[in-house]
Every structure is written in C-alpha cells, then in structure tokens.
Curated annotation (Swiss-Prot):
GO CC annotations, alphabetized: proton-transporting two-sector ATPase complex, catalytic domain
Organism annotation: Treponema denticola (strain ATCC 35405 / DSM 14222 / CIP 103919 / JCM 8153 / KCTC 15104)
Role, per record: Produces ATP from ADP in the presence of a proton gradient across the membrane.
Protein name: V-type ATP synthase subunit E
UniProt cross-references to Pfam families, sorted A to Z: vATP-synt_E (PF01991)
C-alpha cells in the first residue's frame, strides 16, 4: 500500500512538473514571439524614420540648391538691368549734350526741306525743347521765313529734353529726332548686345 501511495505521489509530481515545464515553455515561446514582433516593428519603424529623414534631407538640399540658383539668377538679372539703366542714362545724357544749338540750327532747316519735298508746308510743325526754341527762334525764323509765311509753325514742348520733332500739326504723322527718341534707338541696339555679352560671361562663371 505504501509503495502504491509513493508511486501515486511520484506520478503527481512528475505530471505536475511536466505540465509546469510545458506551460513555462509556452510562456517563453509567446514572450519570444512577442519580442520578435516588437523588434521587427521597431526595426520597420526605424527604417521608415530613416527613409523619411533622408527624403527630408534631400528635399532641403534641393530647396537650398534651388534657392542658391535663383539667388544667382536674380543677382545677374539685377546687375544686368542696373548696367543697362546706367548705359541708357549715359546715352541719353550724351545724345542731349550733342544736340547743341549749332547742330540744331543746321539740322532743322535740312529736315524741313526734306519734309517739304514730300508734303506741304501749311500743316507743318517743328517742336523743340523750351530752352532751344528761346535760343534758336530768331535764327530759325530767318532761315525758315518762307515756310513760316506759308503756315509752318515753330513751338516748344516741355517734354522734349533736346533735339526736335517735325510733323503735321495734328500729330498724325511725324519724325522724332528728339534726344530721347534717338537715345532709345541706340539703347534698343545696345540692350541685346549687352545682354548677350553678360549671358556669355555668365556661362564662364
């Protein structure tokens, strides 16, 4: 009887230990699986974070490069425009300076003669700057007295800095020899040339 009881006790212990071992193994397996999932998830999140960080860094780099390129273009455009403005100002100043009274005194009568060959004198008007008309009115009136007698008029325009305009009294047809118009003509040629020079220079930077 004692032997059977001992065997029963031993069996219970054995079964209990086996069950405990199996349970422990199950717990360990579950823990390992959970740990594996956590690690995989953490690694995936880490990789995603790295990708996002790299993409953001690349975006910032491209944005910075684009900003630098744009700043360079803006600087070149600003420099070119500033240079053209300076050159235009010089051209206009020099053109106005060279339209002195001696030049106008000879040029205006020749322009009137040329106009009269293609049209009448009655409707003709010669417009000068205020200062030039005051200085030249006497000599021009003498040189053009026949045309003035037929209706041609000499008058001043405060908008003209130098030179003159010749045309019909109503302004429907005219030739503009004002300092500004002549300067603009030179500038229209100069601007593309200057732009081309600056463009070629920029390629070498």
């Amino acid at each position: 009887m004692e032997v059977q009881l001992q065997e029963l006790v031993d069996k219970i212990k054995k079964d209990g230990v086996a069950a405990a071992d199996e349970k422990a193994a199950e717990i360990i397996r579950a823990a390992e699986e959970k740990a594996k999932n956590i690690i995989e998830k953490a690694e995936a999140e880490a990789q995603e974070s790295v990708k996002k960080a790299e993409a953001e860094a690349l975006r910032f780099q491209k944005a910075a490069e684009s900003s630098i390129d744009q700043a360079g273009r803006n600087t070149l455009i600003s420099f070119r425009q500033g240079l053209l403005n300076e050159l235009n100002a010089i051209i206009k100043a020099e053109t106005a300076k060279n339209y002195d009274s001696a030049v106008l005194k000879n040029l205006i009568p020749e322009a009137v003669k040329g106009w009269v060959k293609t049209g009448n004198t009655e409707n003709l008007s010669v417009i000068l700057a205020d200062k030039d008309l005051k200085e030249l009115e006497s000599s021009l009136s003498a040189a053009l007295k026949d045309h003035i007698a037929k209706g041609m008029e000499l008058k001043a325009d405060s908008k003209i800095a130098g030179g003159f305009r010749i045309g019909t009294k109503d302004g429907s047809a005219y030739y503009d020899f004002s300092a500004e118009a002549v300067a603009d003509l030179f500038s229209s040629y100069l601007s593309p040339k200057t732009a081309e020079i600056l463009k070629n220079a920029a390629k070498e930077l």
